[in-house]
């Protein structure tokens, strides 16, 4: 969802890419970078980078570029990555288990703190350091741990019901792997990851190549 007093959604989506590239630069021992050099790393024009950053203030100096560490700090603050974000994960099938085991979240200030499923055969099983809980307990856990973020990895037919319960419990942002569009209030953000839809969009280009 996008609000009139916010930068365009596409700008927000690029900020994590900028942050990741800046971290790589620091790891390489590079402490100053131009818009052109940063843009080449993520296939974005220098003008676009300057425009994106201008929504949030003045960064860098003409002819000198950006201080990598300072710019990274500013972007992390803009994204709220200077604080801890607890996340609940609902749906612990093969995909959910892979997400639960992914180690890249914690280094970015994001931590999966609870796993939920409605399958009695899965409840009580351990995935990494966490035990799968009954989805019936999700309201209590969301309240206790002050969770605002959730990941949904359930079948499409269950996704809306799961989202409704999470939102009623206090969740305000959902990352959904379910192949359906969720109906949510205006003050709730939803992002979708649908590998099938992405692959189908890519087959369009492959099919066009075959026609020529």
Curated annotation (Swiss-Prot):
The keyword Repressor applies. Its main location: cytoplasm. InterPro entries: CoA-bd (IPR003781), NAD(P)-bd_dom_sf (IPR036291), Rex_DNA-bd_C_dom (IPR009718), Tscrpt_rep_Rex (IPR022876), WH-like_DNA-bd_sf (IPR036388), WH_DNA-bd_sf (IPR036390). Residues 17-56 bind DNA. NAD(+) binds at residues 91-96. It is found in: Cytoplasm. GO terms for cellular component: cytoplasm. GO terms for molecular function: DNA binding; DNA-binding transcription factor activity. Homodimer. Modulates transcription in response to changes in cellular NADH/NAD(+) redox state. HAMAP family: Rex (MF_01131). Belongs to the transcriptional regulatory Rex family. PANTHER family: REDOX-SENSING TRANSCRIPTIONAL REPRESSOR REX, REDOX-SENSING TRANSCRIPTIONAL REPRESSOR REX 1. This is Redox-sensing transcriptional repressor Rex.
């Amino acid at each position: 969802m996008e609000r009139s007093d916010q930068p365009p959604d596409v700008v927000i989506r690029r900020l994590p890419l900028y942050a990741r590239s800046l971290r790589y630069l620091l790891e390489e021992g590079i402490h100053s970078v131009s818009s052109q050099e940063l843009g080449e790393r993520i296939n974005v024009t220098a003008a676009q980078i300057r425009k994106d950053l201008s929504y949030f203030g003045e960064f860098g100096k003409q002819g000198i570029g950006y201080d990598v560490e300072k710019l990274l700090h500013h972007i992390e603050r803009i994204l709220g990555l200077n604080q801890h974000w607890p996340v609940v994960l609902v749906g612990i099938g093969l995909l959910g288990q892979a997400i639960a085991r992914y180690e890249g979240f914690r280094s970015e200030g994001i931590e999966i703190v609870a796993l939920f499923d409605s399958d009695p055969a899965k409840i009580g099983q351990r995935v990494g350091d966490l035990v799968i809980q009954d989805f019936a307990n999700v309201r209590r856990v969301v309240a206790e741990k002050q969770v605002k973020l959730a990941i949904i990895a359930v079948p499409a037919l269950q996704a809306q019901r799961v989202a409704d319960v999470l939102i009623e419990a206090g969740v305000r942002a959902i990352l959904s792997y379910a192949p359906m569009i969720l109906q949510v209030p205006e003050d709730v953000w939803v992002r979708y990851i649908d590998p099938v839809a992405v692959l189908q969009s890519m087959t369009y280009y492959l099919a066009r190549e075959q026609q020529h």
